[in-house]
Amino acid sequence: EAPVKVNAFISTLFEIAKHYNLTRESFFLAALRSYQEANNNYFEEIELQVEKFAKAYSLDLNKRLNSKDFEEILVEEYGYTIDNDELTQHNELNNLRSVFVPSSKTLLVSSETDDSQRMFIYAKEIAYNFLNITDRLFTFSWIKFDSFDQVLNNFIASYFAGALLIPRKSLVASLKTFFDKKTFSTNDFQMLMDGFTDSPETFYQRLTNVLPKDFNLKNLFFLRFSYKPERGDFQLTKELHITNLLEPHANERNEHYCRRWISLKTIQDLTETTENHVLDSQISSYNHTDNEYFVISSATKDPFRKGYYRSIALGIMINQHSLSRIAFLFVLKIKRRKVGVTCESCSISDCLERVAPPKNLERKARFLQTDMVVKEIMEKYR
């Protein structure tokens, strides 16, 4: 009987997955997120390997490195050949920044790759070699995963790259100074980021490693949105929650994410300006809980898809601990907004940004009303 029940349960999971358009890759990525969250997205063994690598190659982690440093190591130490022309000749590959051909150790890098992307690509290749990882992906960005091991190894190499580009000790020291400021300004945050990298995503991702470990700020989330103006909808393409809090979270039912989120506003602002980067922040108060988050977001053009925009957001829960570690959270000048998760599940009645009716709440109200009337009838005929 037990195997029958287990099989029925598994079949149910697959039916739910199909209903919500979940793919094999979605399951792999969900498993990876669980692994990251279980470890507070901090992995000491990878951090130590980065320090070991830097020492072995006499790299000064107290200063910003450049792509030439990494290219020299790939070519001279690992026998790589770097080709900057081939990918540009194939229009079908304009969404790729690199392809590695293992048989000849040739790394094809797109000529459209900027220096921060090139450094990340090189750093990942160094990780695969230095950590002796062979079951790996060969394109950046990835096209498909054949196994969970490839998903995990891609994460390990990416973590190594982020830790190499943004060394933990230097970042922690800079963050302590930044958090001691009595007032918050986006200019100060931009300067902090510029001291390490030109890539907002690399910087925000790195914050999710060190904030839980070195500042005990574990109630945080990371979101990445994609947007194409012609389509008009926002796609949540990446998320991470260091603790299992409910909001904000991905929605697989094509509902409309709250337009009051700063991560959506920065994208909208970017589409209306000639700037290459829009940076903004707010304190988001969720209407269905008592939770408040300090959220900072960066929006840029999507480097991998023409005509698309993307935003990265980091949210830190405001509680007694975060208030004790981040001085500027006491400042009332940081704008506050009451937000929901999706329009379909939001009870804010006077929202000017609403783009869809609260049909989930309306359906719930109908069910409650029906249940109440049925109970009254049953009581009447007892």
Where is each model-derived feature located?
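Short juxta-domain linker segments that transition from a proline/glycine-rich
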Residues: 1-382
